[in-house]
Amino acid sequence: MPLSSHLLPALVLFLAGSSGWAWVPNHCRSPGQAVCNFVCDCRDCSDEAQCGYHGASPTLGAPFACDFEQDPCGWRDISTSGYSWLRDRAGAALEGPGPHSDHTLGTDLGWYMAVGTHRGKEASTAALRSPTLREAASSCKLRLWYHAASGDVAELRVELTHGAETLTLWQSTGPWGPGWQELAVTTGRIRGDFRVTFSATRNATHRGAVALDDLEFWDCGLPTPQANCPPGHHHCQNKVCVEPQQLCDGEDNCGDLSDENPLTCGRHIATDFETGLGPWNRSEGWSRNHRAGGPERPSWPRRDHSRNSAQGSFLVSVAEPGTPAILSSPEFQASGTSNCSLVFYQYLSGSEAGCLQLFLQTLGPGAPRAPVLLRRRRGELGTAWVRDRVDIQSAYPFQILLAGQTGPGGVVGLDDLILSDHCRPVSEVSTLQPLPPGPRAPAPQPLPPSSRLQDSCKQGHLACGDLCVPPEQLCDFEEQCAGGEDEQACGTTDFESPEAGGWEDASVGRLQWRRVSAQESQGSSAAAAGHFLSLQRAWGQLGAEARVLTPLLGPSGPSCELHLAYYLQSQPRGFLALVVVDNGSRELAWQALSSSAGIWKVDKVLLGARRRPFRLEFVGLVDLDGPDQQGAGVDNVTLRDCSPTVTTERDREVSCNFERDTCSWYPGHLSDTHWRWVESRGPDHDHTTGQGHFVLLDPTDPLAWGHSAHLLSRPQVPAAPTECLSFWYHLHGPQIGTLRLAMRREGEETHLWSRSGTQGNRWHEAWATLSHQPGSHAQYQLLFEGLRDGYHGTMALDDVAVRPGPCWAPNYCSFEDSDCGFSPGGQGLWRRQANASGHAAWGPPTDHTTETAQGHYMVVDTSPDALPRGQTASLTSKEHRPLAQPACLTFWYHGSLRSPGTLRVYLEERGRHQVLSLSAHGGLAWRLGSMDVQAERAWRVVFEAVAAGVAHSYVALDDLLLQDGPCPQPGSCDFESGLCGWSHLAWPGLGGYSWDWGGGATPSRYPQPPVDHTLGTEAGHFAFFETGVLGPGGRAAWLRSEPLPATPASCLRFWYHMGFPEHFYKGELKVLLHSAQGQLAVWGAGGHRRHQWLEAQVEVASAKEFQIVFEATLGGQPALGPIALDDVEYLAGQHCQQPAPSPGNTAAPGSVPAVVGSALLLLMLLVLLGLGGRRWLQKKGSCPFQSNTEATAPGFDNILFNADGVTLPASVTSDP
């Protein structure tokens, strides 16, 4: 009998998850020396599992990587104190400000390894060690991302232990940057076993947390043996094939050193500096180093290249800045038609000003006297020895000069100089034939003429005419020289000049950027004469992308754009991108979307306003040995309108519907998270036309790692003393962050408006008044800031407009950013305050908006010394615009424990009339007030506090909201206009998730019911929550009612909708009662449900004031599935009618045979699997449960607490 379709996946999950089963696919029993050696000997690569990486990572796609999403990949904490490493996500296990999101997923559901805060009085070190690894190739590179929460970690080190020696591959220096930072270190050739260790050290004064994520081992495996090699390749003794240029290059490419044996390389002249300089001559400036770098010399190499050991020797330049150290070779005889090749290893780190140059100095009669520059490397190449090679053909005797010049805080190093067998010293051939007549070679020149300082200007200054332009004014997009020389090598170029516009290659791998002619290129279709920048082969040993950079640039203006022509012909792994390098951070500004098939295309990139210094970098990767003549090129690079003083007509266009472009608005560049100009993405439609453009911030974008994103206007001159900025915003998603509006003026920033959390799947209008000093012409900027404190949802903006004059009163006011134009009156004084310090003289400890002490509200002191008994203090709004239909104004109010008096509410239209009077109950709870409003003219609302003459009393207001439609009854809502009095505040302890509001007619990226229950059509609305965002074992989202009075018996009636794809996916909906007595679960439904609306009724009883809570959570495997609510009705003082039969208790027609057959099969499985299978069957299935309380509530003796230990705040209490 076939297995029932819904039992098979459950059985698989059971077998995989049972503690007695350890199922690992297809072990091929590789020998111990073949395990964790970066080579997949098993077909499924199981011999490389739990090696500090896995054989394949579906998230990263790197060959050997660990993202910590499933497990620690074999990494083990070996700390000897309580300061230790652990696997964590969202800072849940750390006592301190750990990362709120990982690097892999960029959300709070992703995992990483972290070490928490240190409480001890002495320094402690937390160590995380890899399993034993074996045989790293010379090209091996470890790439990872690290995060320091508060920038105060004393030290982070990456160490490699091999035999009795422990090498420090990298050690943190200087201040920590914000967010996740990338780190890449090379291991060098490691023979035999080794381990990698991450060590974090702190002392008693340092706090914060450090985390690691996305470890990747690149190009670490040795080549595999081959029966036959491609033509021209060398067949090693161990049957490995290596390319001919890898012979005698100072590296063990074969893995058995047979490519470096004396038989092959005996005639090469190799200098490793272990015993001296060999045949090379030293001038002042080079020092042979016997000790690796340490804390006193953080930029120096920590190991040599020859031995890959801290005990090895190498050369470093110790010359004074501005004075190069020169190393000269022996004199060589003319090479004739054969190439004299020099392989050398260079180390440039710690400074962008470091430089290593290789010159050819010809000798003898008739030879040119000036040295010829053959190779130059400048800038930061990282903490690695980088291979290079130069081939020399000379008709004259010659010398090779190596000139090293250090920059501030940097180092230039040399190791392993290897001259090929065609480099024949003069002393070697002099015994065979006499030297030609003529003068002897002169001493090497200290500097070639091309590198001498110009005129009398200081080092780094540019001489033009009578000017000495300082370095900070070079490439600042403002011409200082009459001929513009200071802006000529600043990125703009057609590559016809050899200077290439200042672009300089900084590649360290097997690819490089090189200026070539069109005839040289085989990858592009260009046929005309000319030059461009092209990806070409290089001599580096590392498998890294090619990089080429501009000099230091900036500052730039908001209109700055880069225009370029490019081609890309590549397989899927290849790419071409433009990166902005700013103060150590790297921002992806542009990427070729697809291969151009070798056809030249043009594009432009908005760079925007940036501080100095920044650099532009083209990054490329292609497989030049792959099929289809792969390649990439860049030409006609132009930087336009980059001066900060450049203005255009568009700069004054603050009002914008984003249909044509973004007008005067441009994205900030402080992080990798950006606002993007899009069409019908995120929100399914724009606000202007329903089919047009808007600007979008999506925190789920793969590259959105930054904490916030800025959208700025260009500087504006006030058109009037008061202006009104209006805009439409869309803030939607189960865990979306905060949207803010601010104004910058003269270095100060003023917050004008903000919203947090989902506002429903619709566009909302908002406005803010811009106040300027009369007669002032000081420019200002407007700033929309999207905070990435949530990871599921979208933010969008559309239809921004500015007009003279003040704005209407806002429809919503939380008092978080301002007093919303309210003005005090009467005897007392209302004021806006927060209780963050805990020392406020009066007022509630927390606000209602955020339910934290940092939140703001309006409060008035009603104590006798501030407001005598019977006296009033009024708070009057600005004018509201006329209403086209009846509306409901809701607000939350709070009274002191001792009687605060009375709160009256008035409406001012043609006259003033009272619409509401509330006796402000004492207690710790915020309470909801509501009033129906009809106004055909402009109107105001007035809140008036009447003092009761009681000391230490107050009245507070928060969260005023004006919505269309009549006010609902307490605890009831049909969700047609919104959530009514139900609060969906995201609780951080539950993961920060929120219920949302939407309807079937509005497309959403989240699943939802096609129709509501109220109208039964897609035009209706409901509250819903998508449980799939919670993840495995996830937390919950709450929808809470307003505080309701104690009741002996009342009825809660509602309709709910649940839909999940399979039976073993399980969403849960619960009804909780929350009061000062605790939390009680009174109803719940879980498991698979038909996609239809179902009715539920719950008897409610509580001896204390309480709130009703709808809790949505996920009880099983993650799955896309919504839980929705509609037509919630709270019938105070009424018993529920007899509930309809639960659909969970009704068998579906035709299901009996399947059940019987499944039962028989399960019976056989029980015999085989024993008690473990029976336990699983007992847990299988889920039915609605309901707990009916009696009229005399017996107390919360069966209090329900969440498994994650969330402590819920006492938001309601009883009256005193």
UniProtKB/Swiss-Prot annotation:
Name of the molecule in the record: Apical endosomal glycoprotein
Record keywords: Disulfide bond, Glycoprotein, Membrane, Protein transport, Repeat, Signal, Transmembrane, Transmembrane helix, Transport
Domain MAM: 64-222, 269-425, 491-644, 654-809, 811-969, 971-1138
Region Disordered, residue ranges: 280-307, 429-455
Gene symbol of the encoding locus: MAMDC4
Gene Ontology CC terms: membrane
Record topological domains on the Extracellular side: 23-1151
Domain LDL-receptor class A: 26-53, 228-266, 456-491
Organism in which the protein naturally occurs: Homo sapiens (Human)
Subcellular location: Membrane
Main localisation: membrane
Compositional bias annotation for Pro residues: 434-449
Keyword DNA damage found: no
